[in-house]
Swiss-Prot record:
Keyword Flavoprotein: no
Cofactor binding remark: Binds 2 Mg(2+) ions per subunit.
Source taxonomy: Archaea, Methanobacteriati, Methanobacteriota, Stenosarchaea group, Methanomicrobia
Enzyme Commission number(s): 6.3.1.2
Residues involved in Mg(2+) 2 binding: 137, 192, 199
Subunit structure: Homohexamer. Interacts and forms stable complexes with the regulatory protein GlnK1.
Description of activity control: Directly stimulated by the effector molecule 2-oxoglutarate. Inhibited by GlnK1. 2-oxoglutarate antagonizes the inhibitory effects of GlnK1, but does not prevent GlnK1/GlnA1 complex formation.
Annotated protein name in UniProt: Glutamine synthetase
Function: Probably involved in nitrogen metabolism via ammonium assimilation. Catalyzes the ATP-dependent biosynthesis of glutamine from glutamate and ammonia.
Matches recorded under Gene3D superfamilies: Glutamine synthetase, N-terminal domain (3.10.20.70), Glutamine synthetase/guanido kinase, catalytic domain (3.30.590.10)
Binding sites annotated in the UniProt record for ATP: 187, 252, 319, 324
Keyword field: ATP-binding, Cytoplasm, Ligase, Magnesium, Metal-binding, Nucleotide-binding
Length: 447
């Protein structure tokens, strides 16, 4: 499978469509919650779509507009054009992302990609560019006879296991091939800690490209898995008693080609700006946990005992901390935020991480001393004495923190902020009204 030539202009895309016999192009964007929205246009309509955009009804999209002001258009981004390698080569199908605009030609402020681009502009004003390297984990489950997803395991493998314990290595290989064909640089692919859990790591990149890649990654993983008879789930905690799936986010700032976080003259080899960036993340993380960990199920992962963070602290190597500093230095110096999960909208999550870090640098926010002990072994009193706070315990607590946050409101903009909170409050209200199997198991026979 040969990696396709990267397109940067409309002309590049039109030439590739002709050379590769592409018949349909799936135009895509995400709603406020990060769910992909897509519709196909025939290749003959592509040039006009580049010229005039693709019109759609925004009132039918989560978090967009009311029915009386619903006309919107998608402006295609040629740099995101990719041919889908699992589709037939003859009469091929491609995918392209875009930016959402209003009919008057102004960007739609409710577009998650716009929110991230606005944060990027703030960084550029300070002379910075942001790189991100996410680590996405997922489960592969069996399908039932009707092709619907189950939670039936595909194997009993563990961390770094291989065949026969890892029964999905061929599926991962096919996913790797497809991603590489679509321009990803795959760095590692392996079985994770939990049964049927997997991780595929791709090389870091600039923050907008990486957010696009997260959207593409989930789309590719789900598509290939389904073609192979599996269901790929990015649900944070689909199974009780085993590790959940995270999206650890490694991040760094660059200026004039140099890593801003690296300083060879300090004991930790971390710059003062790196420390302030950490301080900004620690200060604001509770306010935007509802975005990095966006669903009710997210908080079943953020509990002690399963390698997920619970407490707000930082450390050089301590994996019980929220923020870890991997050992690599030089241009590889980075900060790893460990709470995000793959259910998040990457555009919004990365925008908030960047904004929080920038505010830390602007306001010289001190992160305090690193916590180099296992935080889970500390008593409540010891954590209190060290000033270690906890992440929100559930989605309701996260929503309440976000509602009172001037920082998050300014970072997301009024439209996204209000629509996102409305959607999350509805989700929580629906959840709390449902009678869960645990309640029946616990109480039915005794009460």
């Amino acid at each position: 499978m040969v990696q396709m030539k990267k397109c940067t202009t409309k002309e590049d895309v039109l030439e590739a469509v002709k050379e590769r016999d592409v018949k349909f192009i799936r135009t895509q964007f995400t709603d406020t919650l990060g769910i992909i929205k897509s519709w196909a246009i025939p290749a003959e309509q592509l040039e006009e779509a580049f010229e005039n955009g693709v019109m759609f009804d925004g009132s039918s999209i989560q978090g967009f507009t009311r029915i009386e002001e619903s006309d919107m258009k998608l402006a295609l981004d040629p740099s995101t054009f990719r041919i889908l390698p699992w589709r037939p080569a003859t009469g091929a199908v491609a995918r392209i992302l875009g930016d959402v605009y209003l009919p008057d030609g102004n960007p739609f402020k409710g577009d998650p990609r716009y929110v991230l681009k606005t944060a990027i502009k703030e960084a550029e004003k300070m002379g910075f560019s942001m790189n991100v390297g996410p680590e996405l984990e997922f489960f592969l489950f069996k399908l039932d006879a009707n092709g619907n997803p189950t939670t039936e395991l595909t194997d009993q493998g563990g961390y770094f296991d291989f065949a026969p314990l890892d029964r999905a290595q061929d599926v991962r290989r096919d996913i790797d091939y497809a991603l590489e064909h679509m321009g990803f640089q795959i760095e590692a692919s392996h079985h994770e800690v939990a049964p049927s859990q997997h991780e595929i790591d791709f090389r870091f990149g600039d923050v907008l490209c990486t957010a696009d890649n997260v959207v593409t990654f989930k789309y590719v993983v789900k598509s290939i898995a389904y073609h192979k008879g599996y269901y790929a789930s990015f649900m944070p905690k689909p199974l009780f008693g085993v590790n959940g799936s995270g999206m650890h986010s490694n991040q760094s700032l660059f200026k004039d080609g140099k890593n801003v976080f690296y300083d060879p003259d300090t004991p930790t080899k971390l710059s003062q700006d790196a420390m302030y960036y950490i301080g900004g993340l620690l200060k604001h993380i509770r306010e935007f946990t509802a975005v990095t960990n966006p669903v009710v199920n997210s908080y079943k992962r953020l509990v002690p005992g399963y390698e997920a963070p619970v407490y707000i602290s930082w450390s050089a190597q301590n994996r019980s901390s929220l923020i870890r500093i991997p050992a690599t230095r030089g241009n590889g110096t980075r900060i790893e935020l460990r709470c995000p999960d793959p259910a998040c909208n990457p555009y919004l999550a990365f925008a908030l991480m960047l904004r929080a870090g920038l505010e830390g640098i602007k306001n010289k926010i001190d992160p305090g001393e690193p916590t180099n002990v296992n935080i889970f072994h500390l008593s409540d009193k010891e954590r209190e004495e060290r000033g270690i706070r906890s992440l929100p315990a559930d989605l309701k607590e996260a929503i309440d923190e976000m509602k009172g946050s001037k920082f998050v409101k300014e970072a997301l903009g009024e439209h996204v902020f209000s629509h996102y909170l409305c959607a999350k409050e509805m989700e929580w209200d629906e959840y709390k009204a449902v009678v869960h199997p645990w309640e029946l198991s616990r109480y039915l026979s005794m009460l």
